[in-house]
Amino acid sequence: MKTVLMLLTCFVFMSGCHAQHDSMDATLWVQTSAEYQGNSEMVFNVAESRLSLLRDKQGVTADIDQAKSFGCLAGMSCPGLAAAGLIPAVVLDIDETVLDNSAFLARLIKNGGQWQPDSWDDWVAERAAVPVPGALAFVERAKAEGVAVIYMTNRRCSVREAGNELSPKQPCPQKLDTLENLASAGFPPLVPVDLLILRGERPEWDSAEKQTRRQYVAERYRIMMLIGDDLGDLASNIKKSSVEERARFVSAHEFLLGNYWFQLTNPTYGSWKSALKGKPAQDYLRLD
């Protein structure tokens, strides 16, 4: 009888509680921890300290594919690239790189929801994301150094069935939303040499992989620096790789990290999560 009562007590206790949302700890870390703020500031401070040096290295690119097109390696001097006279540029991701969308995740947690394309698009239309710590100062410095700023995001172009006052029906309302959000967050306006490139803006840009978009940029610009919160922001054909393949890739390109590639921390979502496949996530836990 005592055992039965204990089981009933446990059942009643558990039924009165709600399971913690998968993103709770990660979102709280982003929104409240000084460590998140410090890490983001550190990444952008290091990147900022490299701006003038990389701007003047006319024969060096951060992009693996651009280097290959000249028969060279990323981060190494390439005479053919130097002779091409391309515009020096930094390529930055947007979400969780320059704009912090943790408020969107916090709302999902409060409402017991999960990420959905429609709710995400509503958030994009709201234009309410705030700057990631350090991002604003970095972009301002890049522009002051005469470096083109290219935003390359996986925000997807899609026609909204019903337009609204802020985003009337158009082929890619998400682009205007993003431009306006950047402006309201304090980022400098784009000038003709700068670019904002969305996923699906052209038919050949419909993949979450950014390779074709970086190739487009590389025709006119020397990609001197890559900044993002996902490994796919730095290199091509890596988003679907396994945990082990991704680790080997990082080890093989260690020299680029902190010199030409700048990786922000994002514990909330990303291709690191989709790499946990083929077995339960808990089986990836290391116990020794």
Which residues are covered by each model-predicted region?
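Soluble non-cytosolic domains of exported or imported proteins
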Residues: A34-N45, N111, A125-P133, S158, ...
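Substrate-recognition element of Asp-dependent hydrolases with the DxDx(T/V) motif
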Residues: E96, E126, A135-L182, L231
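C-terminal cap/substrate-recognition subdomain and adjoining C-terminal extension
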Residues: N45, A162-D288
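Bacterial N-terminal signal peptides
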Residues: L5-S15
